[in-house]
Design a protein with these regions (language model features):
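Active-site segments that bind and position negatively charged phosphate/pyrophosphate groups
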Residues: 1-99
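C-terminal charged capping/lid subdomain of soluble metabolic enzymes
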Residues: 86-157
């Protein structure tokens, strides 16, 4: 069986070469269908709980404005996995992220200079009432988010 991550790599390569190949079409169709199904059937409970609130909170910092939405959401996925203690999954995604220059750490987002207090401002925004980050099991606090970010930093380096 071919790894979906390998198909994604081939699809991006084909897109960059302006070649609408079968692989590219199938990967795009899969993304659109899966996103629609998750959003449609799962509603807010089926979405990546922390990734989008992390994205939204990162936009408080001007240093991140040059990055596309999906790039910041990709970082939010890693923060969520760190919050859940899924380090093997982070390792598995890390190679994939490297292939596409997706951020794995604060330095990749020009944020490696942030203090814990500055990270706490970001975490407070991500943890506002009503944010999907609270769909994660257990109590989600800004301190937990900062801790996950710092632990992710240690894990990546």
């Amino acid at each position: 069986m071919i790894s979906p991550l390998l198909l994604g790599e081939k699809a991006v390569e084909d897109m960059r070469n302006k070649q609408p190949t079968y692989t590219w079409i199938k990967v795009m169709e899969t993304n659109i269908m899966a996103g629609g199904l998750v959003g449609g059937f799962g509603d807010e409970y089926g979405r990546t709980a922390a990734a989008h609130p992390i994205h939204d909170a990162l936009t408080l910092r001007a240093e991140t404005h040059q990055f596309l939405h999906g790039v910041k959401v990709a970082y939010g996925v890693l923060v969520q996995l760190a919050m859940e203690g899924k380090w093997d999954e982070i390792d598995r995604l890390s190679t994939f992220y490297n292939t596409f220059n997706l951020p794995r750490c604060l330095a990749d987002l020009n944020l490696n200079h942030l203090t814990d207090n500055e990270l706490l401002i970001i975490a407070n925004r991500a943890c506002e009432p009503g944010e999907s980050i609270h769909f994660l099991p257990g109590e989600v606090t800004p301190q937990l988010v900062v801790s996950a970010i710092r632990n992710l930093e240690k894990h990546i380096y």
